[in-house]
Structure formats: structure tokens, C-alpha cells
């Protein structure tokens, strides 16, 4: 699915370079007119040229571009066999998606707006005065929503491709009954580690996909 210039659901984003290491670096770089007061630990965006190739040294809505994979998968696939050997049967089904991005948004721990839960990756890796990591997984913490850091940008864009073992079933067949064990959502392989990639974009704090196990007996009655 496409439109002129880019794919449908490809995101128009600011290009994040990294985080500012301190306040003095903020002053040495193009002014970021995206709202709020920009400080050390905030996201540093790339200044893009205009149609004439000129730089205005101001970061605003003109410094966005369509980039990355769309948030709707370009490829959705699945596969799985059903096998039988003597009295045993076995089946499984893998489901996957490729060429898709996840946009992380709505995450604002300790703030007065948005979702205030603290995800583990934030607790483990955020910028602070004692951890001035310009590639930290989360910018500096703030009491109020920091507009500079919540703009849709490549800082929050992730590879959302995944391959999931959706169903697996093992059965034993007797003359009058069949006993089976079935599992759903058993394994997920993905470069995205923050939440179930099948949930898609957002904060990851909606109800997760459940892992389910069933044991059952099927009877057959011959007249």
C-alpha cells in the first residue's frame, strides 16, 4: 500500500540525533522551537535543509521527514504443519509481521499528564545529572509534560517486526477418545523488547496478549 512519495502510515518525524549532554551544548546548537524549555538530557534534533538546500538554524515543523517503516505491517505471514504418527498428532502455527515500525508514545512517569506508570526500561536507563548518557533509553525526567521530548521522532521509533508461536497442540488418540494439550502465544521472537510487539504502537500499558494453556478430552460415540 503506498501513496505518492511514501507508504501509507509511514510516519512524519523529527530526526533525533541523541540527547543533549548539558545546558551549554543546548546553547551551541540550533534553537529548538518545539515547546517547553530545552535542557541537558532533552532530545537533540537534526536541522534539515529547505528545498533550496539552506539551513535556518531553527528546529521547527519544517525539520520533519517521512522515515522508517510504516506502523501498518507491509508483510503479514503465517505457517505451520499438522502431523500424525500412529496414535499421536502434533500441530503448530507461527504468525509474523515484517517491515513495520512501533511508535512509543504516551509514556510520562512522575508527570501530571499522560500515562505515569514507570516501565522497567525507564528505571534502568534514563538521563540524569549523574548519568549523562547521550544515548540513554529515556530523556531527563520532568514533573510536567516536556513538549520537546514528546514530539513524534525517530527517538521513539522502533523495529516492530516479530515472529510468534501462536498455537501448538499435541494429542493422543484412542479408539473412543482423544486427549490433547494446547498452548497459545507461547514464544515471541522480535528485536522489540519493551512489550508484546503485536500490541503495536503506544505506551505498552494496555492489557497484554495472554499466554493460554488448555488440557482437554474429546470423546467419540459410535452408534
Where are these regions (language model features)?
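Conserved small-residue
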Residues: 1-69
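Transmembrane beta-barrel domains of outer membrane proteins
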Residues: 80-84, 171-173, 206, 218-220
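Repeated loop/turn-to-beta-strand initiation elements of outer-membrane beta-barrel proteins
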Residues: 87-90, 176-177
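Extracytoplasmic gating/loop element in the C-terminal half of outer-membrane beta-barrel translocons
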Residues: 8-12, 97-178, 183
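Residues that define the transmembrane beta-barrel architecture of outer-membrane proteins
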Residues: 73-77, 157, 161-166, 209-213
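Transmembrane beta-strands of outer-membrane beta-barrel pores
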Residues: 85-87, 96-100, 167, 183-190, ...
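Membrane-embedded beta-strand positions of outer-membrane beta-barrel proteins
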Residues: 92, 179-181, 217
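C-terminal beta-signal and terminal closure region of outer-membrane beta-barrel proteins
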Residues: 1-29, 125-137, 150, 188-223
Amino acid at each position: 500500500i503506498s501513496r505518492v512519495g511514501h507508504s501509507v502510515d509511514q510516519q512524519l518525524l523529527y530526526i533525533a540525533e541523541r540527547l543533549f549532554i548539558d545546558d551549554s551544548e543546548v546553547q551551541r546548537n540550533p534553537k529548538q522551537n518545539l515547546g517547553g524549555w530545552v535542557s541537558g538530557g532533552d532530545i537533540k534534533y537534526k536541522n534539515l535543509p529547505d528545498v533550496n538546500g539552506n539551513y535556518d538554524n531553527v528546529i521547527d515543523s519544517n525539520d520533519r521527514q517521512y522515515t522508517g517503516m510504516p506502523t501498518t505491517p507491509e508483510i503479514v505471514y503465517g505457517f505451520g504443519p499438522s502431523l500424525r504418527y500412529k496414535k499421536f498428532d502434533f500441530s503448530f502455527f507461527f504468525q509474523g509481521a515484517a517491515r513495520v515500525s512501533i511508535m512509543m508514545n504516551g509514556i510520562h512517569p512522575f508527570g501530571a499528564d499522560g500515562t505515569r506508570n514507570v516501565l522497567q526500561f525507564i528505571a534502568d536507563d534514563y538521563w540524569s545529572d549523574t548519568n549523562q548518557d547521550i544515548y540513554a533509553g529515556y530523556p531527563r525526567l520532568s514533573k510536567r509534560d516536556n513538549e520537546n521530548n514528546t514530539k513524534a521522532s525517530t527517538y521513539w521509533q522502533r523495529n516492530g517486526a516479530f515472529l510468534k508461536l501462536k498455537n501448538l497442540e499435541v494429542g493422543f488418540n484412542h479408539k473412543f477418545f482423544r486427549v490433547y494439550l494446547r498452548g497459545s502465544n507461547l514464544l515471541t521472537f522480535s528485536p522489540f523488547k519493551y512489550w508484546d510487539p503485536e500490541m503495536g504502537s503506544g505506551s505498552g500499558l494496555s492489557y497484554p496478549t495472554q499466554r493460554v494453556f488448555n488440557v482437554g478430552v474429546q470423546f467419540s460415540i459410535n452408534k
